[in-house]
Every structure is written in C-alpha cells, then in structure tokens.
C-alpha cells in the first residue's frame, strides 16, 4: 500500500530538489559555500517555507551566517525560478535556516564512540585483574 503524503509534504520535497539544483547552478554569490538542503517545511497555506541547510566544510558560525545571509538575499530570485519550474500558482516565501541536527548527530556519535571505548578499557582492565 502506498504511503499517504500531504500536499505540503510533496511540495516541500519537490522544492528541496529544485532548490538544490537552482543553488548549485544559478547562485553565483561567493559567500554561499557548499550548501546542502536537508529539509523544506512548507506551511499549510503555502505562504511560507522554512528551508533548512547545512554548509559543508564551513564549521565556523561566521561562515554559516554569511551563507545564510547570501541565501536569504537571493530568496526572491530563487522564488521566481521555483515558480517557473514547479508551475505553482503561488510560491511560498523562502526563509533559510541552519540545520543543527547534523552537527548534533556528529557530536552524539563521538560521545557514544568515546563511551564504548571507555567501556572496553574498563572491561579489559577488569579481565586482567581477575586473571591475576
């Protein structure tokens, strides 16, 4: 059985694909780094869309802010091209936000790996104590 998706989810998914291609091809601003669009959340009335991005290779908050500033200033340009490619009657206003879930995931993975390594050390130390 096919999954049921709402119209806003389908539009958000299509916007994610289209925006990724538009940013790669059309945005020539040097402040925009290697941007990955992680999600697009479209409001129910299709008036606004939150576009969540990550910037690869740019871990400093200043570089991320510069990319966000450049993308938000190019939002009307991107919106115009989205309207042409998606053939929507009204294209949502675009609001770009940094997606911290990727960096949080990396941090949590590092914490888990460190905890596992410490458990192995304690386990090895306990086994060597019982052998003696």
UniProtKB/Swiss-Prot annotation:
Keywords: Cytoplasm, Ribosome biogenesis
GO BP annotation list: maturation of SSU-rRNA
Keyword Cytoplasm: yes
SUPFAM superfamilies the record matches: Ribosome-binding factor A, RbfA (SSF89919)
Predominant subcellular localization, coarse grouping: cytoplasm
GO molecular function: ribosomal small subunit binding
Record localization: Cytoplasm
Transmembrane regions listed in the UniProt entry: none
Cellular component GO terms, alphabetical: cytosol
Pfam families: RBFA
Described function: One of several proteins that assist in the late maturation steps of the functional core of the 30S ribosomal subunit. Associates with free 30S ribosomal subunits (but not with 30S subunits that are part of 70S ribosomes or polysomes). Required for efficient processing of 16S rRNA. May interact with the 5'-terminal helix region of 16S rRNA.
Family: Belongs to the RbfA family.
Assembly behavior: Monomer. Binds 30S ribosomal subunits, but not 50S ribosomal subunits or 70S ribosomes.
The protein's name: Ribosome-binding factor A
């Amino acid at each position: 059985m096919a999954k049921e998706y709402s119209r806003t989810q389908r539009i958000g998914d299509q916007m994610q694909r289209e925006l990724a291609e538009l940013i790669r091809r059309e945005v020539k601003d040097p402040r925009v780094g290697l941007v990955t669009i992680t999600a697009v959340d479209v409001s129910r009335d299709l008036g606004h869309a939150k576009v969540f991005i990550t910037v690869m290779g740019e871990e400093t908050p200043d570089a991320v802010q510069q990319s966000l500033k450049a993308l938000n200033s190019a939002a009307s340009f991107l919106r115009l091209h989205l309207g042409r490619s998606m053939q929507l009657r009204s294209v949502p206003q675009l609001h770009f936000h940094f997606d911290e879930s990727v960096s949080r995931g990396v941090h949590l993975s590092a914490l888990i790996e460190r905890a596992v390594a410490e458990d192995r050390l304690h386990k090895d130390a306990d086994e060597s104590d019982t052998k003696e």
